[in-house]
Amino acid sequence: MEIKRDAYLEQLKIKKDNGMIKIITGIRRCGKSFLLFVLFKKYLLESGVDNDHIIEIALDGIENEELRDPKKCYQHIKERVEDDQKYYLLLDEVQFMSRFEEVLNSLLRISNIDVYVTGSNSKFLSSDIATEFRGRGDEIRIYPLSFAEFYAAFDGDYDDAWEEYMIYGGLPQVLQFSVERQKAEYLKNIFTNVYIKDVVERNKLRNVDEIDTLVDILASAIGAPTNPTKISNTFKSERGINYSNKTISNHIDYLVEAFLISKADRYDIKGRKYVGANLKYYFSDVGLRNARLNFRQQEPTHIMENIVYNELLIRGYNVDVGIVEAYAKNDEGKTTRKQFEVDFVVNQGSQRYYIQVAYDMTSEEKQKQEFNSFRNIPDSFKKIVVVNGTKKPWRNEEGFVIMGMKYFLLNADSLEF
């Protein structure tokens, strides 16, 4: 089974021979190596590039352990370049090499090498590295399979695919297993033995239990506003552990750098400013989140919200969570100031969308809850509610768009309805 990653492959084609280092980033096992060594290499060969002019090095493999030494790697690449024709270097998991930025900068000075690297940690895209590359690094962010990519490779109908995706997520390897137990064991195993191990080793953490518990807390609270103080209090009350705010904040940063989670800032829509406290955290793959909790906490609304968030990132949007303050009457008829939440404030260029995610909108109370946030937003940008199911999009009398998850996920331009 060959899974298509057409959008990412197209980016590589466009950026080919542009004189910059193409840096492919994303969580481990999301398909970066497959994109580079299979799909892009196939494209190069079909374009007439000779096989001996494609240099492939996977630094996470034991067979290339020696090449993790920067000088040896640079020398090896130099020796492979035997003529003046264009060579294509495909370098996988570059963070395994110390001082890799020096090697890449040296390769930039060789005019007939076009360089492509992958990495599973965002630290190597820090401002220091960007300065080292002097504006000659070109990032392509890769995500686990979108639902559209998953569905295209899935052997079954939409309902079965959606159920699978909500439980086991979109890591490509999951599609290779036919037995549910295998999928679950695979996800639980790589979470502990790949992702957590990487975070612990890369950041030289001594207390593995702390990071383990932190991940469990974040997995239990996807879509819920939180902050280091709240998490610290949870550690004290439930575990009897003193875990400082600063340490928690650092550990969350490590998880973000490893692409395991993303954080969504809170934006005050009326005040037009960011609110520092109570961010929301989402997992880069819901299957990993579910595996971390042993598939116990199956909360469809929060899982749907996580999937919508990831889909928006895949489409290239900037995504925040919104709050809007307004005056409203309470149950006693008194007017009080109330804070309404908007699941996502979505921006791209001059475009903005407000999005609510609801598993069920059949009750009048639920409709009121979702629509009241929109009613208090003082602008005319599009307001969309994404609901579970296959409902085709329609616009109600207030101008709000309601669309089913199927339409949202399978139509790349669904926000333009």
For the regions a language model picked out, list residue spans one by one:
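Short glycine-rich substrate-engagement loop in P-loop NTPases that contacts/grips substrate
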Residues: 55-84
